[in-house]
Amino acid sequence: MKNDVISPEFDENGRPLRRIRSFVRRQGRLTKGQEHALENYWPVMGVEFSEAPVDFATLFGREAPVTLEIGFGMGASLVAMAKARPEQNFLGIEVHSPGVGACLASAHEEGVENLHVMCHDAVEVLHKMIPDNSLSMVQLFFPDPWHKARHNKRRIVQVPFAELVLSKLKLGGVFHMATDWEAYAEHMLEVMSSIDGYKNLSESNDYVPRPESRPVTKFEQRGHRLGHGVWDLMFERVK
């Protein structure tokens, strides 16, 4: 399993300036279970980065709607979603290998067979590997908010990224985001609302209630106990 996890930095007009990390590498130590999963399940479920577009029908061995999740953490909710929807295909991207190992272990334990994972920079994967008009859903749950003003430019949700996602979605496909940082939710709403081709699925033209399809994470449950809010945004590709 290879790692090269660099994301572009954007200027105030959304143009790439140089390549820096849009996240902090917190690899930590692998547990024995995670190491075992990477050694034994990665050859079956893992996808190495390639400069060539992936053929989803070949990868999954069938034609089915594809959901891409960016930054799946330890993979608990991703595995739960894949298990609950065996008729769909799921591809997860996470840059931290302990999370990838945990996800592989969980998927194996749950008998999930409609899930593949990658350990690489999602922006580069989108550019190089994901065919245009190929995804039914893109999920981005609780990305790093980079709450300090000087770090806001590191936020993954910027106009160029949202436009890139738009190009990978099928017509009618949905970009689903969630954050527990209100300022980031407002930023996401501003970015997404500025792009022609997206339609906000919120009846009030801002946020949507958490759909049942998105499991509540332990992180989110802890936030609820502390009185923290969570904002879900869902935008459909309409052109």
Swiss-Prot record:
The keyword Nucleotidyltransferase is assigned to this record: no
Record's keyword terms, sorted: Methyltransferase, S-adenosyl-L-methionine, Transferase, tRNA processing
Stored Pfam families: Methyltransf_4
Active-site residues annotated for this sequence: D144
Leader peptide range in chain numbering: none
InterPro entries membership: SAM-dependent_MTases_sf, tRNA_(Gua-N-7)_MeTrfase_Trmb, tRNA_methyltr_TrmB_bact
A Gene Ontology cellular-component term: tRNA methyltransferase complex
Segments for region (Interaction with RNA): 150-155
Catalytic activity: guanosine(46) in tRNA + S-adenosyl-L-methionine = N(7)-methylguanosine(46) in tRNA + S-adenosyl-L-homocysteine
Subunit structure: Monomer.
Family that this chain belongs to: Belongs to the class I-like SAM-binding methyltransferase superfamily. TrmB family.
Entry function: Catalyzes the formation of N(7)-methylguanine at position 46 (m7G46) in tRNA.
HAMAP family for the chain: tRNA_methyltr_TrmB
Protein name: tRNA (guanine-N(7)-)-methyltransferase
